[in-house]
Swiss-Prot record:
Organism expressing this protein natively: Streptomyces avermitilis (strain ATCC 31267 / DSM 46492 / JCM 5070 / NBRC 14893 / NCIMB 12804 / NRRL 8165 / MA-4680)
Catalytic activity, reaction form: 5-amino-6-(D-ribitylamino)uracil + L-tyrosine + S-adenosyl-L-methionine = 5-amino-5-(4-hydroxybenzyl)-6-(D-ribitylimino)-5,6-dihydrouracil + 2-iminoacetate + 5'-deoxyadenosine + L-methionine + H(+); 5-amino-5-(4-hydroxybenzyl)-6-(D-ribitylimino)-5,6-dihydrouracil + S-adenosyl-L-methionine = 7,8-didemethyl-8-hydroxy-5-deazariboflavin + 5'-deoxyadenosine + L-methionine + NH4(+) + H(+)
Residue ranges of every copy of the Radical SAM core domain listed in the record: 69-319, 528-763
Region (CofG-like): 70-401
E.C. designation(s): 4.3.1.32, 2.5.1.147
Xref: Gene3D superfamilies: Aldolase class I
Gene: fbiC
Pathway assigned in UniProt: Cofactor biosynthesis; coenzyme F0 biosynthesis
Protein name: FO synthase
Amino acid sequence: MTTSATSGTGPTANSMRRALKRARDGVALDVTEAAVLLQARGEDLDDLTASAARVRDAGLEAAGRAGVITYSKSVFIPLTRLCRDKCHYCTFVTVPGKLRRAGHGMFMSPDEVLDIARKGAALGCKEALITLGDKPEDRWPEAREWLDAHGYDDTIAYVRAISIRILEETGLLPHLNPGVMSWTDFQRLKPVAPSMGMMLETTATRLWSEPGGPHHGSPDKEPAVRLRVLEDAGRSSVPFTSGILIGIGETYEERAESLFALRKISRAYHGIQELIIQNFRAKPDTAMRGMPDAELDELIATVAVARHIMGPRACLQAPPNLVDSEYGRLIGAGIDDWGGVSPLTIDHVNPERPWPQIDLLREQSAQAGFELRERLCVYPEFVQRGEPWLDPRLLPHVRALADPASGLAHADATVEGHPWQEPEEAFVAQGRTDLHHSIDTEGRTGDRRDDFDVVYGDWEALREAAAPGMVPERIDTDVRQALATAANDPTRLTDAEALALLHADGPALDALTRIADDVRKAAVGDDVTYIVTRNINFTNVCYTGCRFCAFAQRRTDADAYTLSLEQVADRAQQAWDVGAVEVCMQGGIHPDLPGTAYFDIAKAVKERVPGMHVHAFSPMEVVNGATRTGLSIREWLTAAKEAGLDSIPGTAAEILDDEVRWVLTKGKLPTATWIEVITTAHELGIRSSSTMMYGHVDQPRHWLGHFRTLARIQQQTGGFTEFVTLPFIHTNAPVYLAGIARPGPTTRDNRAVMAMARLLLHPHIPNIQTSWVKLGTEGAAEMLRSGANDLGGTLMEETISRMAGSSYGSYKSVKDLIAVAEAAGRPAKPRTTLYGEVPQERQRAAAASDGHLPELLPVLD
């Protein structure tokens, strides 16, 4: 079969010879060379596969599995065969009428699923491969009706629920293939499945966009969408299976490009656990029934090229039921895995191709010099890595079946159900719980983690991704005209004018800050507001992988800590005693904390100090709580409000532009999800602050987009209490230590951002706050002359900025904050979280103690 869409006679002898030599010598291939090698046949193919096999063997030896080829003993569970896509080669997908005529429901029932899983467990299977069509409820009313009738919001909710039952009632480990997933879907499913998967298939967009293409009419087969899923899997630290489908009309160049796209993502996140090379097999009753099957040599060459591209550490699989008896050739080409093989169920995607018997695979592997060993659905490397790749709720299930030495399946493991539950003793005080004191006296233990080179992804790939954002823009707009517009009516500033002002310097910047200060005075007057509050960061254990964050620690790190509920309540009581009206509580995404932990924290404070305003839980924490409890964001926020939550911080925003976010953070929520959390909170009457962290890999155009987004949200909901500028603290930030980020914003940046925040958010967000924690007393006073009207809080303790390297301390007294206001020539006034009047009783308590705790030590210079 010829898969090239271009006319031509194939590669020249010289180009093939050069490419083969580079492969033999272990030199990195490019797309052109890979496309040449994909066409190797005869002796050239033998040469190619021999070098690929050597690469594979080196990887197995390095992994401690020399001479081992693996497989997973599984059952195939087709949860639903309905799908919103229309792939032209697919025989798995059907329509509601056919299901009804065959006596089947729109989805398999829980009893049907568990019956298969129990039978599989009895046969020693350890994997439940759950495969289904993409979002069937979006196309088929019958699917929507089934989900509604059974109490599920969507298909993902059913997948989550049935996975828990499989874990608890059978002991099998779910491997989930629900198709295209969102970032939030990954958060929902990660706690219930050790691994997931989705074939990339191809990056050839024309096969999706052009009529007659195999993926035309299938929204979930757009290559850009599928690549985004692979990125989100990596960001979410989900062990993920992917691969390509060959022989569906792609050119050799397109096939090579698909492999390089997979390599790029694998290198960036280290999360692709296996790569499948699947050969097209035509099926009757499909639009592509007349297309010839991919030839065996096509498959062999692609496996070998994939091995060279992906390298020795990659796990490479070719489905054994899609060839006849040529197992030895697949092994010789560089595979090290046979994939899932079931002694019970058929391959529902390729029903005409039965699985080979496991004994046959063992025999064929032995003939090629390999020992066949069983693995779990999650590969041994991830079993041994543990966190953050495996959720703590899954660890007991995985460990019950895994050989602790190799990470492969334990030969004598009993497959039986275990409770799926939160780890015990989630709220036990652990670690450096005095960090709120000692960060100012002793400092942090070290400036970087020992897993610095792997935990945040591939730094070289990040440098490439960050490069476009680091290029300064050329500004041609007349700054003088922009200043005139700002002075006359800042709401009429065009994007071009706003961008020009964000670049202002010298006299133009001075004029800009004066205009912003005038707008501030007209909007909110001269009072500089502040709040007597206490920060309570209840844990710094976090595996999200934010590259700007120096606060997050692994549970075993010297600076890691978690507070008990009693300690949280004690700190709230201490704050109340010295005049606080608010506690601001945030923490790392600790894998051991249940989704209900946030409710418990809010309740603990309210029970101890009923009058305290609970300002807590960033949008990232909201999403974490919702996904861990199985609630929607709206349901979770409603429950949190009932538990005592009064408002939420608008942190985790960083820059509301995913171009920047995915450089700054590996696993934090995307922009759209941040907006969803904030707007949902506002709709429920839960107000929030808004923030922007700037001065890293961003540019003024990103700041402008961020301001415009916040203004739109405020016009829709009116729920923001203030906007807070957060200059990036670079000193201990991983993204700076890796040489990618700038060393924080300049003084010019700070003045321009503050002034433009005032102008671009006017009149929608009247309160603009500066951060003394990040800028110090003089810097904060300068911001008060540039458009700010609020100094934030006394804090009483602060660890996030201090861990990052800020040198301005962990607290300010009331007198300190009044002095900052006076330095700007303005009066100071206390406020509540919602910018209301502070009760006299609270003011008296604050005055008596100066708004800070007596046991706090002075900040060391």
